[in-house]
Amino acid sequence: GEARENIDADGLALMPGIIDNHTHYDAQITWDSALSPSPALGVTTAIIGNCGFTIAPCRPADRELIMRNLTQVEGMSLDVLRQGIRWDFESIPQYMAMLDRQGAAVNIAAFAGHSSLRTWVMGEQAPKRAATSAEVQEMKRLLHEAMQAGAIGFATSTSPAHNGEGTDDAARAWFT
């Protein structure tokens, strides 16, 4: 059949939207739902939570530690994070609900981050020692909860911030 509308694209360029599969917009999205400058660069989908560094789950007492992780890994300004992050969530389901309520200029997909899960369960000990079996079980439970809330998976890296040793043993234990 015939199209309802024809668009004259003569002299124009057309491209599909870009999926930015490695972003660290987890904090920025709380104060900049436009995710500047991504949309201007053709990004239509951003995947957040990469490398295991996320801002949820996070108890109020752990906010400073979570923000310091971002300054170490991402080179973000601690002052900007302190002034910018709108902490109207603690759990990953609450963070995902906040993303839905607020909306964004692009589609968002979020990983559950290893570092934040460890911090939620282990507090300041998270980067200093290996997790106990009970702590790993609690992190697995939180990961399941995150997946039920819409997280697309689990993100980690070999950063010492995840387990104190910089090895993948702790993450590997989650899937056995």
Descriptions of predicted regions:
Residues 26-28, 53-56, 158-165:
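Active-site environment of divalent metal-dependent phosphoester hydrolases
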Residues 7, 60-69, 168-173:
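Short low-complexity, flexible loop/linker segments enriched in glycine and/or proline
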Residues 13-37:
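Di-metal (Zn2+ and/or Mg2+/Mn2+) metal-binding site signature of metallo-dependent hydrolases
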Residues 149-176:
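Active-site core of metal-dependent hydrolases
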Residues 1-17:
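Histidine-rich, glycine-flanked metal-binding segment
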Residues 25-29, 130-134, 170-175:
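Alpha-helix capping and helix-loop boundary segments enriched in small/acidic/polar residues
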Residues 24, 113-115, 157-159:
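Active-site beta-loop-alpha junctions enriched in small/polar residues
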Residues 31-153:
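Divalent-metal coordination cores built from histidine and acidic residues
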